Amino acid sequence: MITYEEYVKQLKELDVYSTVAFKRVVPYVLIQQQQNEDELLLRLRAPSEKLVGEINNGSNKLVIIDLKISYSHVYQEPQLSIQLWETNGRQENQEEEQVDEIYLWYPNNINETLAIPTNLFTIELDTVPRPRVERTTTDNINNSGSKKLMSSSAWYVVHSCDTSEIVGTPIQNYLQRWASVYIASWWGIVRTPNNC
């Protein structure tokens, strides 16, 4: 376990790309990184040779993977959430340059799709709250004053149970060790799914 305060401190220092395992599998391109006090979102694009492969009648491909690191107050552990985005490769306007549409993709078996060993940890589809932009009375949308509105979206969530047993209990570099296990250990092995 790690306290929220220690988690926030280590999150500021976390460099997922510095883990040894991640350095070996650099084929994924970081296209966006957002960080606030207690969350880190990495949006990665898979290069063409690492695409999961053809799915849904041979036309769709995985193109973007979002990894969100947050804190589970219930388990007092870091939590990894995953979203997959696919493209259908369809041209919207044949006369102009090709524009791919991208969609959230929820494969039947996330472990198989991302080649994550099922004995490593449990992954389940769940809704994850996300804060929306604060609105004030000047927005003419929310007349009740300044409120932080919440919405939620579906993510694959890696269950936080047994994290201390997997990562080890020393607090020093806890989050870096966690990232090595929960992200870098499986990240380099994306393959074609058999059952989507």
UniProtKB/Swiss-Prot annotation:
Identify the InterPro entries for this entry: Atg3/Atg10
- Signal sequence region: none
Can you name a GO cellular component term?
A: phagophore assembly site membrane
Q: What Gene Ontology biological process does one annotation of this record name? A: protein transport
- As recorded in UniProt, its EC number(s) are 2.3.2.-
Keywords of this entry: Autophagy, Membrane, Protein transport, Transferase, Transport, Ubl conjugation pathway
The subcellular localization recorded is: Preautophagosomal structure membrane
The molecular function GO annotations come to: ubiquitin-like protein transferase activity
- Membrane topology listed for this record: Peripheral membrane protein
Give the similarity note: Belongs to the ATG10 family.
Role: E2-like enzyme required for the cytoplasm to vacuole transport (Cvt), autophagy and nucleophagy. Acts as an E2-like enzyme that catalyzes the conjugation of ATG12 to ATG5. ATG12 conjugation to ATG5 is required for proper localization of ATG8 to the preautophagosomal structure (PAS). Likely serves as an ATG5-recognition molecule.
Q: How does it assemble?
A: Forms homooligomers.
Tell me what this protein is called. Ubiquitin-like-conjugating enzyme ATG10
Q: Which species? A: Vanderwaltozyma polyspora (strain ATCC 22028 / DSM 70294 / BCRC 21397 / CBS 2163 / NBRC 10782 / NRRL Y-8283 / UCD 57-17) (Kluyveromyces polysporus)
Q: Coding gene?
A: ATG10
